[in-house]
Amino acid sequence: KRPAGYSATDDRLTAEVLKRLNGNHLEKFPGDADLAARIASYELAGKMQITVPEMMDLTNEPDSIHKQYGTDTGSDLKKEYAKNCILARRLLEKGVRVVQLFNGSDPSGGNGITNWDSHSNIKNTHAMQAEIMDQPTAALIADLKQRGMLDDTLVVWATEFGRMPFLQGNGTGRDHNPDAFTCFLAGAGVKKGHSYGTSDNFGAKAEKDPTSVYDFNATILHLMGLDHERLTYYHNGLERRLTNVHGHVIQDVLA
């Protein structure tokens, strides 16, 4: 927020003076890439200070959008998540290429009070989290579609693990299950209404077409136009892939 008595013109003139000073300093060290990168990052931060406040102001969204996302109903946690979903769409409209949203990320000490980590009280906790997430998430996808943005936007809904099919401890919660859980993809390049893979009858382990996180990442990278076998990063003396050596694109989910 701009301080009282400090106008937009003052802000612009200050930025112009700073840019000239930085440019003069950079001319003295023409080969200093770190200095150039730091100046560029400050300039980007300055541009964000000018454009971000307007973009984050959701009061100019029509009532129909607020109703669609549910910013005015339910718990405060749901309202905030719904606002973040609208903000995600606005960021995409401005050309931001990657937007990440979190749901149920509040710490709980393992009791699942404000997140999905329900080692106890799973019935009430998951009901609360589902109420927070369902309407805004569905509204975001529908909104992207109605604006013609879903054709070139990939929506990835993912988690790190699921829950065991049996109760634990005091009988009201369930432990982590890394062997069977659900993620979904929507939008650009993905089949509509298609499911891939199944678990056993208990929901304990993936049984048909098990998918690793490397396969999942390879598929996402493919949909983003990146070859996961050629995209490498130097780490500990080796060129490493994000998909390790055994990740494969899941062809069956591609449109």
Regions found by a protein language model. Give the residues of each.
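Ligand-binding pockets and gating/stacking loops
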Residues: 1-255
